[in-house]
Amino acid sequence: MSFPKVSKDNKGKKDAVKVQFLADSLEIVLDKEKCTGCCACVRACPKEAFSRYQPEGPKELFGKQIIYKKKKYQVPFIYDPLDCSYCGLCTFICPFDALRLKVNGEEVPPEKLKLVQEKAVPQLDYKNVKLEDGREVKVYTKGSLTIDVNMCNTGCYNCAEICPSGAISMKPDIVTKKRGEYEQELEIEIEESKCLYCGACHEACPTGALKLTIDEVCYSGEYNSPFWDEAIERLKISPDDTSA
């Protein structure tokens, strides 16, 4: 029998990847019901082990740009268990507490990670925000959110539907007459005081109309460079970021 042995489980409400050595096992588990698809894990991962869902862009039908709705948003996850280093950074930075590292079958809380104990990462300065559905979110990033209405011409509603805090709303009730035809226009509202700057809307937008900026990661305490410094740069998002 050869080691390490790898396995994947993507059935049910959780996804898991596992690597089994002769004496020890390491596992990353994703709770799909908690995950919003914000892709903080994708950006932060030092091994680029996570794969993200790519929203399908608009298509032209009878001269109009439309988006075919998907019934379910896809969540990011690790497709090759050997790509992951099982360091646990993804569990440390996940705003929605959707990821867990298991060592020999036992869950390791983020504050007990070896990364924390060895001071490879500092302490996150976050505030707990309780959502209407009862979930709590760790908000430790700051930035801004705007929308380019000229690029948002499809009415897909992805951003409003995926936003966990209700910061984005759309009102498709404005009807105007153009070129002799009546057309429905979207009125988009962003209540930035509700924004968690998690990145879910940024990831779900198929046209790049949403311009999310994450320019500050809040933390304090000692840490060892360069691991955390590089993670911070990966966590940030600029309006021109086309990697999503």
Kindly give the residue locations of the regions a language model identified.
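Local sequence-structure signature of Cys/Sec-based thiol-disulfide redox active-site neighborhoods
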Residues: D31-K32, V149
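The feature marks the first
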Residues: K14-E27, E33-K59
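Flanking helices and flexible, charged tails adjoining ferredoxin-like Fe-S electron-transfer domains
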Residues: M1-A23, G57-A244
